[in-house]
Amino acid sequence: MSNETPQQPTPANELLEALGTTLSPDLLVQALTHRSFSHEHPGVANYERLEFLGDAVLELVSTETLFTIHPDMTEGQLAKMRAKAVSEDALSAIAKTKLKVGPYILLGHGEAEQGGAEKNSILCDIVESLIGATFLEHGIDEARKVIHRLIDDTLAEVATEGPALDWKTSLTVKAHGLGKEEPVYHMEVSGPEYAQIFTARVSLGENGDIIGIGKGSSKRKAQLAAAEAGWKSLDSFKTRTK
């Protein structure tokens, strides 16, 4: 394969309109260039440095926003909300639904054949690299506007989830608040090896009464389901004792 840099496509105006800013063509192309493409075309810069920068800017702005709009939340609650709002799942969904960036990502042949334009990890990286490019070209104020445009509805959504952000942690906190012992998860596995069903029963203390039961295709999913049931059980108990 030739090492000459190919004619690089300029993304459609719709992408920049969705992003809500402008970027120089060279910087925009870099923000969309995966390392597999630059490996096949030496001398073409990829998005990794921009992603590194964008990740830091995104963390700053999302933290600042949550800190401001939720003055009564603890550090732990804010950290959980931020983690979910800027998670790989959340950012890749933004890349797919808001930016529709997949067709514009520059990938090496192998990565393209493996569906790289639809991989959540790459889509997440692209969102961060575009934020980094915005910060580099326009500064923090413009980057802040872009971030709000992209994630404000996600921040609002996670704010309504409350304990659902982490049922196991939420159950532990509620149990401690009621003066109860630490939650203990008792596991059972059934079904053939290729289709195992995990059942978790959660009690407060090793020998306490079972307060929640959950099933799932993995130990983690079963424990989360049990923790949710246990949390709701304790929430009902707390309401009855008021």
From Swiss-Prot:
UniProt enzyme class: hydrolase
Biological process terms in GO annotation: mRNA processing; regulation of gene expression; rRNA processing; tRNA processing
Reactions listed under catalytic activity: Endonucleolytic cleavage to 5'-phosphomonoester
Cofactor or coenzyme needed: Mg(2+)
Location of this chain's protein in the cell: Cytoplasm
RNase III domain sequence ranges: 12-139
Alphabetical list of SUPFAM superfamilies matching this protein: dsRNA-binding domain-like, RNase III domain-like
Active site: D55, E128
Subcellular location, principal: cytoplasm
Keyword Phosphoprotein belongs to the record: no
Keyword Transferase annotated: no
Keywords: Cytoplasm, Endonuclease, Hydrolase, Magnesium, Metal-binding, mRNA processing, Nuclease, RNA-binding, rRNA processing, rRNA-binding, tRNA processing
Any single GO CC term annotated in Swiss-Prot or TrEMBL for this entry: cytoplasm
Assembly and binders: Homodimer.
Record function comment: Digests double-stranded RNA. Involved in the processing of primary rRNA transcript to yield the immediate precursors to the large and small rRNAs (23S and 16S). Processes some mRNAs, and tRNAs when they are encoded in the rRNA operon. Processes pre-crRNA and tracrRNA of type II CRISPR loci if present in the organism.
Protein name: Ribonuclease 3
